[in-house]
Amino acid sequence: SILLDVFFTTNILLSLLILMVSIHTFRPLDFSSFPTVLLFATILRLGLNVASTRIVLSAGHTGPDAAGKVIEAFGEFVIAGNYVVGIFVFAILIIINLVVITKGAGRVSEVSARFTLDAMPGKQMAIDADLNAGLLTSEEAKKRRDDIAKEADFYGSMDGASKFVKGDAIAGILILLINIIGGLIIGIAQHDLPVSTAAENYIILSVGDGLVAQI
C-alpha cells in the first residue's frame, strides 16, 4: 500500500506537470512528444489500476485503508459519509470525463489532423513560391517543409492517442464495477462481512481508486 501511495502521488504530479507544460506551449512542435507522453501516462495509470484492483479484492475486507492513504482519502472525500451518494457523484464525474472531456478531445484531435493534412499541399506550394521568388533560402525552405511534416505527424499521433485515452476511460468504468461487485461477493461470501460493512469498505476503495485513476 505504501508503494501504491507513492506511485499514485507520482502519477498525479506527472499529470499536473503535463498539464502545465501543455498550457505554456504555444506551438504543437514545442511539445511534439506529447502523444508519446500521453500514451506512457495512460499505460502507467492502467498498471496502477491493475495493482490497486488486486489489493482491493484481496485485502479490502480489512478496511478502507487497505489500498493506501491516497485511495482512502479520495474515496472518503467523494463519499462524504454516504456511499450511495458517493457512487452517484462518481458516476457524474465519469460521465463528464467520458462524454464531455474524452469525446470532445478526441473530436478536436480528429478534426485538427484532417485540416492539417488538407492544408499540407497549399503550404508546400507557398514554400515553393517563396523559394522561387527568392524570399527563402534552400535551408529555410527545407526547415519549413520539415516543420509541416512534423506537425502533420503530431496531429496524426494525437488522433490515435485520443482513441487510446477513450479506451482507458471505458476501462476505468469496468474496473470500478469489477471492484464493487467482486469486492461485495468476496467480502460477504469469503470473509463473512455484514452487507453494510462490505459495501462501505469496497465502495470507498473502488470509488477512491477510480477517482485517483481518472485524475
Show which residues each predicted segment covers:
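Hydrophobic packing and interface segments
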Residues: 1-215
